[in-house]
A protein has these predicted regions:
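An amphipathic alpha-helical interaction surface
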Residues: 78-148
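Membrane-proximal alpha-helical anchors
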Residues: 1-71
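Short, flexible coil/linker segments at or flanking structured domains
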Residues: 3-4, 9-14, 29, 33-36, ...
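Extracytoplasmic/periplasmic/luminal assembly and interaction segments
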Residues: 54-94
Length: 148
């Protein structure tokens, strides 16, 4: 009888120890996933900066956007180029939003976006044309983020 209780206590301690180990492993894995997510977001930003740095035309278009131009102020091909570039930006913010909703990023991730370009006249025009390509929850979130 004493041996049985001793074996049960050993078994219980083994189960508790295993659960603690699993909990620690899950925590470590979550930390690794968050780190990888933050790295992916940083890579997206770096790619956008690289395009602007290496492509004089794109750098010029971004500069013009900050001069409050609208779609009618540039050629159709320039507009399409800026549209594609800004869609990268919108998708980057959408990715941050989805990772935030999934608990992989904190709300402070949005403070590092650099919302200035998204408040310009031409980028608002692009957004108005393309907002239907995004989930309604994200549209509402993005517009509140952009406008505040």
């Amino acid at each position: 009888m004493k041996n049985r209780k001793f074996i049960e206590i050993i078994g219980l301690l083994s189960v508790v120890g295993s659960l603690i180990f699993v909990g620690l492993e899950i925590n470590q894995n979550t930390t690794a996933v968050r780190g990888a997510t933050q790295q992916a977001v940083s890579s997206q930003v770096a790619e956008m900066y690289r395009i602007g740095a290496e492509n004089e035309r794109m750098a010029n278009l971004v500069s013009k956007a900050f001069q409050d131009i609208s779609k009618t102020d540039i050629s159709e091909s320039d507009y399409v180029s800026l549209w594609m570039y800004q869609m990268m930006g919108f998708r980057r913010i959408e990715n941050i939003y989805l990772q935030y909703k999934n608990g992989l990023l904190t709300k402070d991730a949005f403070s590092r976006i650099g919302m200035g370009i998204y408040r310009t006249k031409i980028v608002r025009e692009i957004w108005d044309e393309r907002r239907g390509d995004f989930e309604p929850d994200f549209v509402e979130f993005f517009e509140e983020l952009r406008d505040n």
